[in-house]
Amino acid sequence: MATWNASQIILNSMSNIIESPQSKPRPVMASNGASLFIPVTMEVPCDQGTRMWWAFLASSMVTFFGGLFIILVWRTFKYLWTVCCHCGGKNKEAQKVVNVASSQVTDGDYKPTDDKEEVGVAEVGWMTSVKDWAGVMISAQTLTGRVLVVTVFALSIGALMIYFIDSSNPIESCQNFYKDFTLQIDMAFNIFFLLYFGLRFIAANDKLWFWLEVNSVVDFFTVPPVFVSVYLNRSWLGLRFLRALRLIQFSEILQFLNILKTSNSIKLVNLCSIFISTWLTAAGFIHLVENSGDPWRNFENSQDLSYWECMYLLMVTMSTVGYGDVYAKTTLGRLFMVFFILGGLAMFASYVPEIIELIGNRKKYGGSYSAVSGRKHIVVCGHITLESVSNFLKDFLHKDRDDVNVEIVFLHNISPNLELEALFKKHFTQVEFYQGSVLNPHDLARVKIESADACLILANKYCADPDAEDASNIMRVISIKNYHPKIRIITQMLQYHNKAHLLNIPSWNWKDGDDAICLAELKLGFIAQSCLAQGLSTMLANLFSMRSFIKIEEDTWQKYYLEGVANEMYTEYLSSAFVGLSFPAVCELCFVKLKLLMIAIEYKSEKGESRILINPGNHMKIKEGTLGFFIASDAKEVKRAFFYCKACHDDITDPKRIKKCACKRLEDEQPSALSPKKKQRNGGMRHSPNTSPNMMRHDPLLMTGNDQIDNMDSSSVKRYDSTGMFHWCPAKELDKVLLTRSEAAMTVLSGHVVVCIFGDMTSALIGVRNLVMPLRASNFHYHELKHIVFVGSLDYIKREWETLHNFPKVSILPGTPLSRADLRAVNINLCDMCVILSANQNNIDDTSLQDKECILASLNIKSMQFDDSIGLLQANSQGFTPPGMERSSPDNSPLHGVARQASITTGANIPIITELVNDSNVQFLDQDDDDDPDTELYLTQPFACGTAFAVSVLDSLMSATYFNDNILTLIRTLVTGGATPELEALVAEENALRGGYSTPQTLANRDRCRVAQLALYDGPFADLGDGGCYGDLYCKALKTYNMLCFGIYRLRDAHISTPSQCTKRYVITNPPYEFELVPTDLIFCLMQFDHNASQSRASLSHSSHSSHSSSKKSSSVTSILHTASANRQNRVKARDSRDKQKMGQAEKKWYTDETENNYPRNIQIKPMSTHMANQINQYKSTSSLIPPIREVEDEC
């Protein structure tokens, strides 16, 4: 009956349409009297009481399975055609080959005779071109393809929005296409989707797999129902929610638009899009079945749920909460929930935590640096750890640097740990951290490297492979320079030979401020200077590090040491009041009046080149705009040299009152060198050695035609390297410098340097050349060079020998520094310095064990006992030696008096400097100190005494170089013996020094100052040694001998009134004027090159160690101990004559230090006869005096 009523209603409606096509909808009465309002259109009438969902679903299913059936039939037909015609195809192909061959035989050229083949080829080409065109249209490789892909995605999201709007209506309802605006828009969208589907179908290589793709399935179940809706005048939500699956392609769309560039951002968007699209799609299915009901139950169990309630239900289901307020009632809904909860739970548990982690990390260390107006920033990269960053920030942000208006941006590819993060938060106002790599241009853009003031690259000083670490830093330099060639880069390098690779970078230019701080070069240079003046390594390390002043009231050695530690190196332009004065006069005025210690100036030549001159002497006159190098406690004190005015400040006694006056001076226009930005970019001070021939004093060495040049240097003999900065000899074979233990025992070495090396074939190279070069500087005369004896593994030394074979006075004893027999063979108790180095740092998990060999060797030497007969001999052969003190032999010691304990009976008195890798291991070197393990290195007794050195003290050079690159030039000039960029380029080319002929230009490079220690017990300064003032000593040494004093090396217990047996000394840097001296003090000084030392070895007192001066007062120094020197020379000659007589009986030839007949003034260690060897052994056993074997040498 109900079916008949529905049919009657439809017939009545159709009759109305036929009678009046323009009639409006009107109520139709059913047989049961019910009134139904049905919108009537021209096409098909809509009945609200009838459900037509099957028609919409059938359209999609017919489209999907119909197309799938056609594709399968076509593939089957094609396969059968290929199989059936396979044999026939072979016959045709064979016939074709025969025809071609016959055609070539008759005509000579191949001419196609089958016109049908031409048509086939043309048809295939047309189909291929259409397919290629469709592929280009839908690909993102072209602009058109990208626009089309983005448009399709945007329209899919629009269709999904229309679905959200329609979801508030019933699942199925009557709608007039001409009046429903949303249906019209949805129709337009789906027409576009249909066209795009056709392009994709044409471009697809495999039609079957294309038909089964997710995007194709979405089109099947969303496009056909729209056309059915127009025809039936009714709407069915159906499966339109499948458009949410298009969100999976969101990350691809953003990549096409170049919005997503990093892997983390792509991963984050992928996870979010998959999660959201799955959530929305599942919610749409639940919304459909719950609002429709089960078909087999005649849709009676439906419930009214909005789409958003379904989303809520799916979320609480995935999270396994399940409150129960909303739940599925239909069988289809519950069945779907059973399967969805398995996948949804897995997705929720894996995707959500990962999304939260990515979002958290991205907000923390992502993003880009925002530059602050008026504030500079630097980028720090490389080895970023808690230790390296804390050391860097401690020195860079030190309060003594005045106001540092620079922001520090750290860039590293690993996120910081909690401790490092806390350090960044502590300095959050000046420090920022970004996660990334300098090898990635995108990350360089994030930190604004193009606007950065400089880029600093830190190295891992404790790595197992130094060459690999240097290679990494060089790659960082290449990447940064490739991104921005003009950026200033300061990088740390571990190995000296790797600095050469930086010269291969086209945009690397040290004249523009680029610097490479070679840790091995400077570390070994510091240690080498300690061989010449013990304790100097500690003083220099403290000068170039920022230390806060620590006040101690007790009268202990720590009080005076810490007062000196507070001093640093600064630069400042000199006031015009100093113009025209000589360098010593300015130094005296600054020290006495301004309480400043000036040690060097920057000299600008007429060509505009700049050079750093260290204590140039009284011939140098100060010019306008001269830059001075000062030792002071803070930057404000150095400003006195810039503000000083003779008219206003001449009568002021308090230096704190010297401030800027009202006088108009030219200095006001000069920029301050204390600015964090480097002011001088000409780089001339590093263009050549620190001296220049045209500004040397007029002494006999440089006078043309002088006999000295003819006598000292022949044009046919090479004694110096090509730059004239170092002593040089022809390359020697390794076997010629080897000593056996017996040979070394028969050679009484004295005043030499013993270098103990721990290394093997697998150890990283130390770069011992950097230790030897400062000891072979040309500002020493040949007879002043200390003999160097290496004790260590021969396999390791062979690897280093290529860089050492051009240096004179070098010997090797294969053995181990832990062997007391080897140490006694090289007379370690008579050495001027024992250096302990280690290269065994590989594969050690515990960092505290990296120094085990060096610590064991140091303790081993200190526990050795010696016979004091050798010491008595040395003491008796040298006059004017204070009690408990002894001077080195003038023939072996370059400084004529570096203090050393006489009559050494215990190894504790042997001067030793030990290299440490781990700072905390310094506590094991001295057993009698009370240093706490947590004490900083510079506060420990071994470091204060100059017996320990660690590479960590060089960390401060990074910040010091950034604020003023002249500082690095000064320190390299002081510790390397005169290494220049030209010499580095030469070493990079040949990996060895090249000999050069002696010319006036190269000989002029010898005229540069050197560091020495001045004894106060006897000599011209003896009157000041007992209670005198340090300021009086400073002025007297400067006026009389052009010697610039800058520190004291004092006995540790000198302040104690009772006598002490302790021979340890500590360093006092830049003591004040009124500082009281004691007789046992040794004074650090910068002395001039002595041109007359080659004429007379004993022309100076062993106590004064003063250099030659053009002043007439220099003659008084020669006459002070003339008698003692003459007597000593007579003893030397008598002893040498006896040795020559005994050597005539020798049966064995020993090595010569240089090639025979090549160097007329060579050193020869003369052989001994068997009788003399037995006699020496007898002397050793009976504690008799051993006559030392002297070296026969001529002076150069």
Swiss-Prot record:
Ranges spanned by the short sequence motif Selectivity for potassium, renumbered to the chain: 320-323
Its subunit composition reads: Homotetramer; which constitutes the calcium-activated potassium channel.
What is the organism of origin for this protein? Answer: Xenopus laevis
Q: Where primarily located?
A: membrane
Intramembrane region ranges (chain numbering): 304-326
Q: Name one GO cellular component term.
A: postsynaptic membrane
Top-rank taxon: Eukaryota
Q: Where is this region: Segment S8?
A: 581-601
Which pairs are disulfide-linked? none
Annotated domain remarks: The S0 segment is essential for the modulation by the accessory beta subunits. The S4 segment, which is characterized by a series of positively charged amino acids at every third position, is part of the voltage-sensor.
Motif location (Calcium bowl)? 914-936
* Protein location: Cell membrane
Protein name in UniProt: Calcium-activated potassium channel subunit alpha-1
| Gene Ontology BP terms | potassium ion transmembrane transport
Residue spans of biased composition, Low complexity class:
1098-1119
Function, as annotated:
Potassium channel activated by both membrane depolarization or increase in cytosolic Ca(2+) that mediates export of K(+). It is also activated by the concentration of cytosolic Mg(2+). Its activation dampens the excitatory events that elevate the cytosolic Ca(2+) concentration and/or depolarize the cell membrane. It therefore contributes to repolarization of the membrane potential.
Every copy of the RCK N-terminal domain together lies at: 375-517, 750-894
Q: Where is the composition biased (Polar residues)?
A: 1120-1129
Q: Where does Mg(2+) bind?
A: 407, 430, 432
Q: Where is this region: Disordered?
A: 672-697, 1098-1149
